[in-house]
Each structure stands twice: as C-alpha cells, then as structure tokens.
Amino acid sequence: MTQQELTLYNLGENLDQLMNLDPRGYGVCRILYPAARALAKEPLTIHGAKFLVSNIKGGELVYIITGFVLLPFKKAEMDGIVSSVLLARSLIKAFGAKPVLICPEENLKAAKALTSVAGMHCYESVEEVQQFPISM
C-alpha cells in the first residue's frame, strides 16, 4: 500500500466512523453500514468521492435529493439541507457542475436562504440553473 492509498484509507475510515455516530441509539447505521461496506470494499466516503470524480463533468446537471418533514410537528429537518447546499457549492467549485436540489416544500425557505449564504444563486427552473453560473 502506498502512502497515498494509506492516507485515503485512513481518511475514509475516520469519515465513515464520524458519519456512523448514533447519539440517539437508533442502531440503523450499525445494521446497514457493514453490508454497504462489504459491497464497496473500501470506506464508503472514499467510494462515493471516487464515483463523483469519475462521473461528474463540467456543465452537467447533478440532482441532490434531500430533506424530510419531522412528524408530527410538520417541521423540516435542517442538517440534510445544510449539507446538501454545501455539497452543491463544492460540486460547482470542483467540477463546474449544475446542481439541482430536490426537497419537500417545507424545506424550500431554508434551502433558498442557505443558497445565498453559500454564495450561489437560487432559481426555480432547471433551464435557469443551466444558463447562469454559480447557481442551483
């Protein structure tokens, strides 16, 4: 194993462990992660990053599906929206991608506000996203 391979492996292991923290004790990640890891044969974060690097081309649309409504409160969750907007910005900067965020209506207000904070423009149509730079 080269130094670069070891670094990627360790980085992926650390990120995977961080993302599998289960402070509420639901246990779902502990059930699903081993099967996904066995299929990928490497840390899932590294596997996903390699997939993005291999498949995203400049100017292409990338669909990001995120968000859900917390029942019975009928309030939108926020961590997925924040992460998705930051992912969109990263895909624009790294690849020149054209991200399209798909989320429940309850998440739209937050998504639009976060888009501005992340230095992007938010449009209602895919055509506008394709036309204008740094947009989502």
Please give the residue ranges for each predicted region.
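Short internal beta-strands
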Residues: K98-E106
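Short, charged/polar "capping" segments at the starts of alpha-helices
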Residues: E106-A113
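Positively charged, low-complexity intrinsically disordered leader regions
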Residues: M1-L61
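Fold-independent oxyanion-binding glycine-rich loops
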Residues: T66-F68, P104-E105, I134
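A glycine-rich helix N-cap at a beta->alpha junction
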Residues: T115-M136
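Short, glycine-rich nucleotide/cofactor-binding loops
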Residues: A36-K41, L61-V62, T66-S83
